[in-house]
Amino acid sequence: MRGNPLIHLLAISFLCILSMVYSQLCPAPCACPWTPPQCPPGVPLVLDGCGCCRVCARRLGESCDHLHVCDPSQGLVCQPGAGPSGRGAVCLFEEDDGSCEVNGRRYLDGETFKPNCRVLCRCDDGGFTCLPLCSEDVRLPSWDCPRPRRIQVPGRCCPEWVCDQAVMQPAIQPSSAQGHQLSALVTPASADGPCPNWSTAWGPCSTTCGLGIATRVSNQNRFCQLEIQRRLCLSRPCLASRSHGSWNSAF
């Protein structure tokens, strides 16, 4: 079967162009230094893109080209257009599966895990979000326990409320000033009277990057009653591309 002569001519021309480009990028014969380069600890020696000389493999986030190849043992490939402002090539993971790494352990995208007994986390697109497992309830001062406080009980995960024995008061009728101060936290303030401020500190942001939600317990509302309040938070901007993030010091 005879082919089109024009197609044959184009194919031959294309092969000639490829051979010219290859000869410019990869000179023949190979010219390598007598001594191999000294690589940083943990960086292996690999053959360059021309298959001639041994070079230090490029690591995650480092620039790469036809000679300086990425570390194949780490699953890195040279991604064109991934450099600053979309220019140049950078070593990235071959398959960005959205997994995340916490305390040296890798979790799959969508997998839930407990870094400790106080929080439940979920791996989500290279980052992770966590929810508290310990109760955020608030114990108000009372006549028999005017100063409640949280303590860490041995053998228990979540802190518990106890009454400080050093300040325990006998079961007597409190003074009018003390009674007014304590009852103001329990009963709603009148429309004309001010609301005494009783608020906990804002909790951590629910996400490691991008917009998240932080919570606290406060009585700063129109009814002067304790409630869980929420607000938007931003820990840091998310990267444009997903990365295998590690947050070993988070817990």
Curated annotation (Swiss-Prot):
Any one GO BP annotation for this protein: cell adhesion
Record's subcellular location: Secreted
Glycosylation sites: 197
GO cellular component: extracellular space; nucleus; plasma membrane
Protein name (Swiss-Prot/TrEMBL): CCN family member 5
Annotated signal peptide: 1-23
Organism whose genome encodes this protein: Mus musculus
Disulfide bond sites: 26-50, 30-52, 32-53, 39-56, 64-78, 70-100
Secreted keyword on record: yes
Similarity comment text for this entry: Belongs to the CCN family.
Keywords: Cell adhesion, Disulfide bond, Glycoprotein, Secreted, Signal
GO molecular function, one term: growth factor activity
Function description: May play an important role in modulating bone turnover. Promotes the adhesion of osteoblast cells and inhibits the binding of fibrinogen to integrin receptors. In addition, inhibits osteocalcin production.
Domain VWFC: 98-164
SUPFAM superfamilies listed in its UniProt record: FnI-like domain, Growth factor receptor domain, TSP-1 type 1 repeat
